[in-house]
Amino acid sequence: MKNLTDSFVYLGHWPSAGSFGFNTDILATNPINLSVVFGVLIFFGKGVLNDLLDNRKQRILNTIRNSEELREGAIQQLENARIRLRKVETEADQFRVNGYSEIEREKLNLINSTYRTLKQLENYKNETILFEQQRTINQVRERVFQQALQGAIGTLNSCLSNELHLRTINANIGMFGTMKEITD
């Protein structure tokens, strides 16, 4: 590396009279040297610059192409997400409507069932009241009959003597005998 640097230093110190060389003093540079340097730079630099620009252009185009592909993919994903969202919203609306109608149906069924149960309870209550009334009426009749029978027995016992009692029995036996003859 040192040899290479030394050779450039020696080139810069060549004598300027009658020879061709590099002038390292920028203020003393002549237009011919500048044009040669610019010509070499343009000749060799043009290809390098074109390659750099082409590479840069290709990278930019690839980046744009990739961005477009990603954009299209993102748009497709967004569209798919919107479709799924609409589908889910539709299903949610159906569940909501079905749920409300199911709730209303259950509510009506519950109301009807409760009404029938209340009606049955009312019928049972009325039947129980009627049964209790009949039982009470029968008990009252039985007591009235027992009291009337006891009163009649008491009255008969106090009014009837043994002789009257025997006559009544004989008359009744006679009536039964007559009835038996008629039925035969």
UniProtKB/Swiss-Prot annotation:
It is found in: Plastid, Chloroplast thylakoid membrane. Keywords: ATP synthesis, CF(0), Chloroplast, Hydrogen ion transport, Ion transport, Membrane, Plastid, Thylakoid, Transmembrane, Transmembrane helix, Transport. One of its GO terms (cellular component) is chloroplast thylakoid membrane. Signal peptide: none annotated. One of its GO terms (molecular function) is proton-transporting ATP synthase activity, rotational mechanism. It comes from the Eukaryota. Its main location: plastid. Pfam families: ATP-synt_B. The chain crosses the membrane at residues 27-49. It is a single-pass membrane protein. F-type ATPases have 2 components, F(1) - the catalytic core - and F(0) - the membrane proton channel. F(1) has five subunits: alpha(3), beta(3), gamma(1), delta(1), epsilon(1). F(0) has four main subunits: a(1), b(1), b'(1) and c(10-14). The alpha and beta chains form an alternating ring which encloses part of the gamma chain. F(1) is attached to F(0) by a central stalk formed by the gamma and epsilon chains, while a peripheral stalk is formed by the delta, b and b' chains. PANTHER family: ATP SYNTHASE SUBUNIT B, CHLOROPLASTIC (PTHR34264:SF3). Belongs to the ATPase B chain family. HAMAP family: ATP_synth_b_bprime. F(1)F(0) ATP synthase produces ATP from ADP in the presence of a proton or sodium gradient. F-type ATPases consist of two structural domains, F(1) containing the extramembraneous catalytic core and F(0) containing the membrane proton channel, linked together by a central stalk and a peripheral stalk. During catalysis, ATP synthesis in the catalytic domain of F(1) is coupled via a rotary mechanism of the central stalk subunits to proton translocation. In plastids the F-type ATPase is also known as CF(1)CF(0). This is ATP synthase subunit b, chloroplastic. It comes from Arabis hirsuta (Hairy rock-cress).
